């Protein structure tokens, strides 16, 4: 169906947002020690309370901004929402470059969290410009870009002076903003605003087809059906296509639509559980506390080097996950990767508590754990968020789920330090293991396979009612 080149190039440009977000989010990890020391580059050393705020302000910023992301997606569109958020990241680096005051650094970190709705915007944007056959891989690439940004941040932070790191971050973020202007708006967004001709031009651009080709007309008709779903009969996509006339659906408010659409409600609840469970598999803790964890787990190795290798492992796993998303499917990835995450956490927990094996076992599973997590919980929920919702609820449901993600991140980071002091690393990993196994079980029972399906077909999977058991 046309060329995939412009879809891939468009995805690559959108993924510059993820790279820049990975750079700015990882930046605090290797500056905490510097900011606490007497040789700090700031106007004074940070206090313990300020360090706590420094590590968590990004989550607070995300909680503030995410509720507005759905509104901006609908009002500004996917393209200009991307530009708006990317400009916020550039502003972070401008503040850090111009000021050395502790207060301004904390404000910059807060602003980085406010700009983090990039994760929501980019996933939606990518899913709407790519055809079904590559949608999963391209959407998963968004999370790969974040891992690459983390890796880049660790490498630059390890080899560049503090000021030079700030300049590089600024240049990368400004370049990302400029590149986004080259893209065309999502065809689904244009069609939802009644701009059918512009939507056809957008599809023609990304598919490299003539605007009057049959493929484009078919895709526009599919989008129209998605924008005018039959909520009363829960008709299958095949039944919808057999209807001779496609009358415009009654315009419903968001809550009226949710009340009438069983498939939308079920898709939301299932994704909510998967997203929450994914956060509590615990990788965010390992990312933030990488250096002290490596110091305890592998005392003979350099914590900084181990942290860089952690980012390398996650980047590699992200690339593998992106490849497998449209090959193996979303559901198997979530199930088997969660099982692998649980086993890794169980091994790490017993090793850190009982020290039953040599140090290399700890080292191996310290990298297997984030790789398994990235292949499953770190990728699949974001692919599902981008593809399972009808256009009428997509922005708001996606916003709620990403908001929940940040709430869970804040909770786990807030309770982690006292929990660690109370029970130690071993039992903490037991908790992560238990939640990983529960995620695998839940995914096996409730998560449908959405590989290669359009949103109509996906909604049909969620609309299916369980068949009653027949007694013999």
Language model feature labels by segment:
Residues 206-216, 232:
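Short intracellular "coupling" helices and adjacent cytoplasmic loop segments at the cytosolic face
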Residues 203-206, 223:
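AAA+ P-loop ATPase catalytic core
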């Amino acid at each position: 169906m046309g060329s995939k080149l412009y879809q891939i190039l468009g995805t690559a440009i959108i993924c510059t947002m993820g790279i820049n977000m990975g750079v700015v989010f990882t930046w605090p990890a290797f500056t905490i020690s510097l900011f606490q020391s007497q040789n700090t580059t700031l106007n004074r050393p940070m206090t313990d309370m300020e360090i706590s705020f420094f590590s968590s302000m990004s989550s607070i910023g995300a909680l503030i901004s995410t509720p507005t992301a759905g509104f901006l997606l609908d009002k500004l569109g996917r393209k200009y929402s991307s530009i708006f958020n990317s400009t916020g990241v550039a502003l972070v680096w401008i503040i850090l470059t111009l000021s050395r005051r502790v207060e301004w650094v904390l404000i910059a970190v807060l602003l980085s969290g406010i700009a983090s709705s990039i994760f929501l915007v980019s996933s939606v944007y990518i899913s709407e410009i790519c055809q079904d056959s590559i949608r999963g891989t391209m959407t998963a690439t968004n999370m790969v870009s974040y891992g690459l940004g983390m890796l880049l941040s660790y490498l630059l932070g390890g080899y560049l002076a503090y000021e030079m790191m700030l300049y590089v971050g600024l240049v990368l973020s400004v370049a990302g903003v400029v590149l986004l202007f080259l893209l065309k708006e999502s065809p689904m967004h244009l069609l939802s605003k009644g701009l059918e001709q512009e939507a056809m031009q957008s599809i023609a651009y990304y598919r490299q087809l003539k605007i009057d080709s049959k493929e484009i007309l078919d895709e526009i008709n599919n989008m129209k059906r998605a924008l005018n779903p039959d909520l009363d009969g829960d008709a299958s996509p095949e039944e919808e296509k057999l209807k001779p006339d496609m009358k415009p659906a009654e315009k419903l408010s968001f809550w009226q639509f949710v009340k009438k659409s069983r498939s939308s409600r079920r898709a939301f609840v299932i994704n909510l559980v998967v997203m929450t469970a994914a956060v509590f598999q615990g990788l965010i803790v390992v990312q933030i506390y990488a250096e002290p964890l490596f110091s305890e787990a592998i005392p003979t190795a350099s914590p900084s080097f181990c942290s860089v290798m952690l980012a390398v492992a996650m980047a590699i796993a992200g690339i593998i996950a992106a490849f497998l998303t449209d090959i193996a499917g979303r559901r198997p990835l979530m199930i088997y990767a969660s099982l692998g995450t649980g086993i890794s956490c169980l091994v790490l927990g017993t090793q850190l508590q009982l020290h039953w094996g040599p140090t290399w076992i700890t080292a191996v599973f310290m990298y297997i754990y984030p790789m398994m997590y990235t292949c499953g919980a770190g990728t699949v929920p974001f692919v599902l968020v981008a593809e399972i919702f009808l256009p009428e609820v997509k922005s708001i449901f996606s916003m709620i789920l990403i908001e929940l993600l940040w709430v869970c991140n804040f909770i786990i980071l807030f309770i982690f330090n006292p929990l660690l002091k109370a029970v130690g690393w071993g039992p903490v990993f037991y908790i992560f293991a238990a939640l990983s196994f529960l995620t695998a079980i839940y995914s096996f029972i409730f998560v449908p396979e959405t590989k290669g399906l359009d949103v109509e077909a996906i909604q049909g999977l969620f609309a299916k009612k369980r068949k009653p058991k027949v007694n013999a």
